[in-house]
């Protein structure tokens, strides 16, 4: 709820990151707008991960959670209303299609640009990413394409979160587009090379090792040094028992409760 958002907490932050999924339901939509208002009031950088998931907009069945794109003008118009509020917008090619309301990427990007002067980061999968300031080029190739890390893909879960964490780690510290993209692509590449999501996120020590390797590491999961670094450089904390409720899995939990009486 909007009243649950802490202005003081947001004011203490360098950046506020919100995903597009949060705008798909009314309650979280209002809470997100409240958070954005606080961020703007305190000059906190505002970041949107478009994160388009058709199933969470009611455009795909529950069994189609992996579906990444379904064109829908209502969703496009809904997303376009909030685009002007952000300083940085990140998405895949398909996610910019929904944001721009077109199935042609460049046309979609031009529509987004008409709505916001934000920096746009287009994720290009294994190719890497491109960062767009100002006018949209005639071809993406006319701008800088920052290459991805070539690895054996074992699991794509968490790739987008890892990419964003890497990019933001540079961006909030005023790093160059090239450095932000290098960090983002490396984080995404390492996560997809592992059989995990959040626990697979790399540390700075792992990134340094990857960047300084004299040869490309295409199988990070088989690199003994990387495995060791991931074990010993991830901060450890003894947490008390946690009970976590994921809002996008409510119906499954309700069914379990009903079956259990």
Model-derived features: where do they sit?
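Acidic, amphipathic alpha-helical patches
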Residues: 5-6, 79, 153
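Solvent-exposed alpha-helices and their adjacent loops that cap or buttress functional pockets
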Residues: 8-11, 82, 113-114, 234-239
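Short gly/ser/thr-rich secondary-structure transition/capping motifs
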Residues: 1-3, 69-73, 102, 224-228
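Conserved phosphate-binding/catalytic region of the ribokinase-like
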Residues: 37-41, 74, 101-224
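Conserved beta-alpha-beta core of the PfkB/ribokinase-like small-molecule kinase fold
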Residues: 15-111, 118, 126-135
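Conserved N-terminal subdomain of the carbohydrate kinase-like
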Residues: 1-20, 208-216
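Alpha/beta catalytic barrel-like cores
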Residues: 216-261
């Amino acid at each position: 709820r909007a009243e649950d958002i802490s202005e003081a907490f947001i004011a203490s932050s360098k950046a506020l990151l919100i995903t597009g999924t949060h705008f798909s339901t009314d309650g979280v939509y209002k809470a997100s707008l409240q958070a954005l208002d606080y961020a703007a009031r305190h000059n906190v950088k505002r970041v949107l991960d478009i994160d388009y998931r058709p199933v969470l907009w009611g455009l795909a069945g529950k069994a189609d959670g992996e579906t990444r794109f379904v064109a829908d003008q209502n969703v496009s118009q809904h997303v376009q209303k909030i685009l002007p509020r952000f300083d940085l917008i990140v998405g895949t090619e398909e996610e910019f299609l929904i944001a721009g309301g077109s199935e042609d990427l460049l046309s979609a990007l031009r529509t987004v640009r008409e709505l916001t002067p934000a920096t746009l980061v287009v994720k290009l999968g294994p190719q890497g990413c491109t960062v767009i300031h100002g006018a949209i080029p005639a071809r993406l190739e006319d701008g800088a394409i920052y290459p991805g890390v070539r690895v054996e893909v074992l699991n794509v879960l968490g790739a987008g979160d890892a990419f964003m964490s890497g990019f933001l780690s540079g961006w909030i510290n005023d790093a160059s587009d090239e450095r932000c993209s290098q960090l983002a692509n490396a984080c995404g590449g390492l996560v997809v090379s592992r059989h995990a999501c959040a626990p697979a996120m790399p540390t700075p020590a792992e990134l340094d090792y990857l960047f300084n390797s004299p040869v490309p590491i295409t199988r990070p999961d088989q690199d003994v040094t990387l495995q060791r670094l991931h074990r010993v450089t991830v901060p450890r904390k003894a947490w008390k028992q946690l009970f976590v409720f994921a809002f996008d899995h409510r119906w499954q939990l309700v069914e379990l409760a009903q079956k259990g009486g």
